[in-house]
């Protein structure tokens, strides 16, 4: 079943950890593409210097961060790679969780085509399908068109995985510093990256 609106409410760090093991789903041209979330990063504006909303900075791009939890925040890095975030916290508190890596599940052939323009790929290429925020967006067809979309929609949502199928029993959740935020002064060291230790699709060990 889809995660209800209440799933995204509450402390952002706790929501980040709850997202691990759940399934991110995007329906593209009627075909389901999905992956199990194995790595996330929490961003807690306005006090977090790594957050786009640090200091309460409000722009056209970040406006969705100030809205209701349970919406998609998508942005570009380096002008070419999309990043997908889940908005958390109450209205007016601009916080969210970046989805950093997935284990692909549904629509594998479409995911391969999106990433490599072919379906016959090597084992190394398979491991690189969705092991990074830009890679997973390309694989699932997530673009700026999805910015601000409610995660209660039929085409973009988080699907809760049943307890008996959840991979949390197989992997330990580890916390550590977030990646590529050297500009963020003391926030560089916050242990707000959560991931399944040893999972092959985690972006950085």
Swiss-Prot record:
Pfam families: Pur_DNA_glyco. One of its GO terms (molecular function) is alkylbase DNA N-glycosylase activity. Its EC number is 3.2.2.-. Keywords: DNA damage, DNA repair, Hydrolase. GO terms for biological process: base-excision repair. It is an enzyme of class 3 (hydrolase). InterPro entries: Formyl_transferase-like_C_sf, MPG, MPG_sf. PANTHER family: DNA-3-METHYLADENINE GLYCOSYLASE (PTHR10429:SF0). Belongs to the DNA glycosylase MPG family. HAMAP family: 3MGH. This is Putative 3-methyladenine DNA glycosylase.
């Amino acid at each position: 079943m889809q995660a209800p609106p209440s799933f995204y409410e509450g402390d952002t760090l706790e929501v980040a950890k709850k997202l691990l093991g759940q399934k991110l789903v995007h329906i593209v041209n009627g075909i389901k593409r999905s992956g199990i979330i194995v790595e996330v990063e929490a961003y807690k504006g306005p006090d977090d210097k790594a957050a786009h909303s640090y200091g309460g900075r409000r722009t056209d791009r970040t406006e969705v961060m100030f809205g209701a939890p349970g919406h998609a925040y998508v942005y570009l890095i380096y002008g070419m790679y999309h990043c997908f975030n889940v908005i958390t916290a109450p209205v007016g508190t601009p916080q969210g969780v970046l989805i950093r890596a997935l284990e692909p599940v549904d629509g594998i052939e479409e995911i391969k085509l999106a990433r490599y323009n072919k379906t016959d790929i090597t084992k190394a290429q398979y491991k690189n399908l969705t092991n990074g925020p830009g890679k997973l967006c390309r694989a699932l067809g997530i673009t700026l068109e999805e910015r601000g979309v409610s995660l209660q929609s039929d085409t973009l949502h988080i699907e809760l995985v049943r307890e008996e199928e959840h991979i949390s029993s197989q992997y330990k959740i580890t916390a550590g510093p977030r990646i590529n935020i050297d500009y963020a002064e003391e926030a560089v060291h916050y242990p707000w990256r959560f991931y399944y230790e040893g999972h092959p699709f985690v972006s950085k060990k």
